[in-house]
């Protein structure tokens, strides 16, 4: 079957032929309909330091998808051929302390679809039954294939109370923008979005941000809020500047959730900015399985167009490189690939 591959340890991805996966007794084979291109796929394409240290070619990439169950292993009971499904891309070991206490999203032995195991940028993908998610009929394919990034946003937002809160969002990439939509629908009192790029700030307005700023200026944020700073900070960028400025913009007793991944060491004034202010800080990794998925489904059933403005490019799968280049030059937010015509 045709697939998008990291065929060799170098810059780029290519179309190539790979075998259709065979499901084991507890696996589900899914005929892929739509996929989303993630920033992780871009890192693999660009073969940066992270990718070259983690990825072992040849590898089918991709982890955001929706499709139809084609076949199941003999022990599978929860789905059958013809069911419309997506899937959780973090495959926990099932045996460690985290997995056995409902925290498989932080399993130390996790395998990630399209990173550690063969991914979904192909006509077929195979996942354990325990990772499969039946998609509600009310949710369209283009949005259903984005449950992975939407789930990251949902997990970050729902890690603390947000109803009636004044929230600072640092970074308006796709996940930050999704978080703004969730905050708006979830009853946040004020959403202040920060991003250095004008087109992202415009999208933040579209998603419902009350105020958009080029940088997290302490005096500006404190003037906008009536509580001497934001109640909640969601850090989605991993930017050194954003983190250092953001901690100055929150009130004492604020909640801070960190999803963005820094690529350098960042000095924080821990005593003045964190300890004496009594902040509660949470690290966010992936989606809680499957609490976050239920929350995503509920939101998208009731707010069917919530993330529609963020899908800027819809392309056939064989034009994937066009989508990645659009992400690189900043013209794309979310790119959805159609696998309808892929050859098997």
What does each model-identified segment do?
Residues 223, 227, 265-313, 321-322, ...:
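C-terminal substrate-binding/catalytic core of Rossmann-like NAD(P)-dependent dehydrogenases/reductases
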Residues 54, 93-170:
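NAD(P)H dinucleotide-binding glycine-rich loop of Rossmann-like/cofactor-binding domains
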Residues 3-22, 39-71, 86, 107-118:
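N-terminal glycine-rich cofactor-binding segment
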Residues 160-163, 202-280, 321, 343-344:
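Glycine-rich cofactor phosphate-binding loops and adjacent beta1-alpha1 units
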Residues 197, 262, 287:
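Residues in the short beta-alpha loop(s) of Rossmann-like NAD(P)-binding domains
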Residues 137-217:
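Mid-domain Rossmann-like dinucleotide-binding core that forms the NAD(H)/NADP(H) cofactor-binding site
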Residues 21-35, 50-97, 136-138:
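Glycine-rich beta-strand-centered segment in the early N-terminal region that forms part
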């Amino acid at each position: 079957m045709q697939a998008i591959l990291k065929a060799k340890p170098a810059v780029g991805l290519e179309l190539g032929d790979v075998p259709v996966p065979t499901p084991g007794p507890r696996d589900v084979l899914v005929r892929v309909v739509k996929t989303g291109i993630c920033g992780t796929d871009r890192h693999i394409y660009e073969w940066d330091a992270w990718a070259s240290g983690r990825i072992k070619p040849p590898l089918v990439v991709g982890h955001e998808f929706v499709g139809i169950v084609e076949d199941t292993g003999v022990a599978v009971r929860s789905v059958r051929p013809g069911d419309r499904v997506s899937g959780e891309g973090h495959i926990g070991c099932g045996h460690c302390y985290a997995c056995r206490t409902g925290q498989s999203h932080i399993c130390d032995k996790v395998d990630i679809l399209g990173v550690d195991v063969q991914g979904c940028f192909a006509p077929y993908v195979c996942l354990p039954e325990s990772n499969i998610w039946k998609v509600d009929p009310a949710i369209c394919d283009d949005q259903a294939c984005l449950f992975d990034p939407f789930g990251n946003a949902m997990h970050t937002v729902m890690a603390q109370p947000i109803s009636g809160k004044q929230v600072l969002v640092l970074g308006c990439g796709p996940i930050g923008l999704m978080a703004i939509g969730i905050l708006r629908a979830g009853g946040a009192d004020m959403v202040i979005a920060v991003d250095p790029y004008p087109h992202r700030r415009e999208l933040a307005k579209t998603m419902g941000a009350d105020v958009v700023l080029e940088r997290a200026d302490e005096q500006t944020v404190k003037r906008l809020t009536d509580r001497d700073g934001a109640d909640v900070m969601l850090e989605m960028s991993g930017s050194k500047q954003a983190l250092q400025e953001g901690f100055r913009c929150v009130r004492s007793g604020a909640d801070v959730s960190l999803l963005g991944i820094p690529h350098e060491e960042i000095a924080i004034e821990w005593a003045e900015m964190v300890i004496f202010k009594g902040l509660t800080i949470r690290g966010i990794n992936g989606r809680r399985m499957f609490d976050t998925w239920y929350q995503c489904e509920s939101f998208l059933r009731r707010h069917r167009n919530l993330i529609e403005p963020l899908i800027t490019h819809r392309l056939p799968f064989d034009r994937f490189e066009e989508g990645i280049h659009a992400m690189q030059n900043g013209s794309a937010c979310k790119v959805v690939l159609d696998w309808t015509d892929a050859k098997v």
